[in-house]
């Protein structure tokens, strides 16, 4: 176990931001912390990084209280925070990388193959010798991620890591994060609002609403908590246009949904479509539907599936 968060409370100006927050983070997992804007996600990350102190409760890293570890803790963790300037605007991209390499006291230098590969993967080669004060938001995010990814830290905190990135860069980043977890056995803790990122990466999910944990458990169980009407979808080869079927057509395939597999099958037989059927599958609730469910349960019992 990497982290144990026990009964954490945090207040600002007599307002409670986090209340009785408790959960555990396991090694080599990707944990996604979900919540609306202002739910307390970034405050929680800052507490786990030791940047601010809790008013009540304890945070343990490998069984030791953060308050007792001291500066050596930061040899084990690295972070990119959305609300914090992670780089120096008056330095070039290259100079920022060299500066943070020096702080980390690693044996590698700027010309290391892995660092050069990251620069190319995130399309920063043409701007790497320019002052980062002129970078776009997406470029700054990419540079911050390169600096974070090049450390030997066991734990990586990523606060809204794909914010400001285009689709292709987001996809590349997700692949890199997954690789870090599976191949380099890093523990990754991230916050995100983007459903596709959550679907691609989450092993474990923590949902915070109004400063309290309303769900904690693995990703598949997270989706299964929603009481919903069963829905089935048939995928049919070709573009089928018929008013009764109410098809959704995409990339040469037609998609038909019904609440019963018997109803769906009967409809396909009626319209002589069984020979064109690719598959029928039961649909799971989306991330958005699941979050809406938990938000609607405010004031109820915390859900926990370990």
State where each predicted segment sits:
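Conserved ABC ATPase "signature" region
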Residues: 98, 102, 110-127
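Conserved ABC transporter NBD signature motif
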Residues: 57-68, 72-74
């Amino acid at each position: 176990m990497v982290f144990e968060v026990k009964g954490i409370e945090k207040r600002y100006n007599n307002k409670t931001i986090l209340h009785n927050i408790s959960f555990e983070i396991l090694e080599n997992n990707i944990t996604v912390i979900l919540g609306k804007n202002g739910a307390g996600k970034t405050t929680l990350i800052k507490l786990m990084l030791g940047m601010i102190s809790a008013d009540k409760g304890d945070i343990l890293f490998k069984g030791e209280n953060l308050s007792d570890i001291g500066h050596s803790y930061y040899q084990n963790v690295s972070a990119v925070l959305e609300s914090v300037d992670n780089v120096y605007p008056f330095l070039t991209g290259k100079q920022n990388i060299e500066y943070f390499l020096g702080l980390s006291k690693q044996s590698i230098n700027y010309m290391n193959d892995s660092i050069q590969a990251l620069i190319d993967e995130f399309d920063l080669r043409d701007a790497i010798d320019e002052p980062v004060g002129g970078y776009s938001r997406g470029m700054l995010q990419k540079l911050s991620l390169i600096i974070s990814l090049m450390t030997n830290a066991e734990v990586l905190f990523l606060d809204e890591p794909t914010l400001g990135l285009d689709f292709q860069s987001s996809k590349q980043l997700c692949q890199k994060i997954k690789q870090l977890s599976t191949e380099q056995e890093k523990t990754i803790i991230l916050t995100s609002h983007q459903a596709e990122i959550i679907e691609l990466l989450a092993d474990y999910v923590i949902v915070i609403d109004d400063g309290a944990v309303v769900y904690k458990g693995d990703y598949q169980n997270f989706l299964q908590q929603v009481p919903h009407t069963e829905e089935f979808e048939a995928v049919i080869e070709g573009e089928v246009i018929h008013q009764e079927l109410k098809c959704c057509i995409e990339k040469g395939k037609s998609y038909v949904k019904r609440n019963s597999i018997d109803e769906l099958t009967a409809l396909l037989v009626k319209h002589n479509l069984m020979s064109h059927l690719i598959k029928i599958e039961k649909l799971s609730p989306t991330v958005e539907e699941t979050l809406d469910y938990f938000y609607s349960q405010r004031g109820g019992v915390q859900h926990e599936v370990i």
